[in-house]
Amino acid sequence: MAKPTPAPRATPFLLAAVLSIVVVAASGAEARWYGGGGGGGYSPSPSPVSSIVSEQLYASLFLHKDDAACPARGFYTYASFVRAATRFPRFAATGCADARKREVAAFLAQISHETTGGWATAPDGPYAWGLCYKEEINPQSSYCDATDKQWPCYPGKSYHGRGPIQISWNFNYGPAGQALGFDGLRNPEIVANCSDIAFQTALWFWMTPRDTKPSCHQVMVGEYRPGPADVAANRTAGFGLVTNIVNGGLECNRAGDARVNNRIGFYRRYCQVLGVDVGPNLDCEHQQPF
């Protein structure tokens, strides 16, 4: 792998136990950009994603995202999600009905894991706590790859994980900003401050092939065509390959990784809710990272 894969380091998943303490204590026993607000009652124009996930369903999938204990409470609105999706017209709109639903389930599962506040015995189960965080907690560094001259780091800026997919590193913030219309190198903080931009960065990552990697979208809708190197690395199409694209350097080619299993747990739940089978190759245990 030429460069690290964008992913949080001190992930919300690893910090869920801390949140569980907070939850128990509280209960007693992220011109063209839209701002982050927007409460209930949003009526989007018909769109591929809104035809699959209604506002009511969205609220039920992310049951605890606005709990007082979640740092991202009030941030990840349905309106922002749908508005962001309109910038990517092929998202949730490619292939048959099952393929479209499966892609949405996979996307929501990946962002749920990246932002989860759940734990094994959490109220309503561990898979009801997606979108609880909008920013990496206690980042270990500024995630600046100084060798990347195309996307040079700006002094004093940190490129740690932010937003639903926890985009990280200067070589991701830079091109994401260029594609979406903001300065990702000088103003990476906007990903944690504007919910529309936060969702757009996640969808940009989802839809965009990078270097030797296919896009997550291509994998989930059947457009991925493995080359000889992919075949040799056992990078077979399925949800597991999406995990490889997102964070394979840390999670793939190893047995029983808890993070991989957590992603699969979210994915199974969302596929069940949407009434679609999960498809093959859910994990990346035997895949070489990109």
Swiss-Prot record:
This is Chitinase 10. It comes from the Eukaryota. GO terms for biological process: cell wall macromolecule catabolic process; chitin catabolic process; polysaccharide catabolic process. Glycans are attached at residues 193, 234. GO terms for molecular function: chitinase activity; endochitinase activity. The active site is at residue 114. Keywords: Carbohydrate metabolism, Disulfide bond, Glycoprotein, Glycosidase, Hydrolase, Polysaccharide degradation, Signal. It comes from Oryza sativa subsp. japonica. Disulfide bonds join 70-132, 144-153, 252-284. Its EC number is 3.2.1.14.
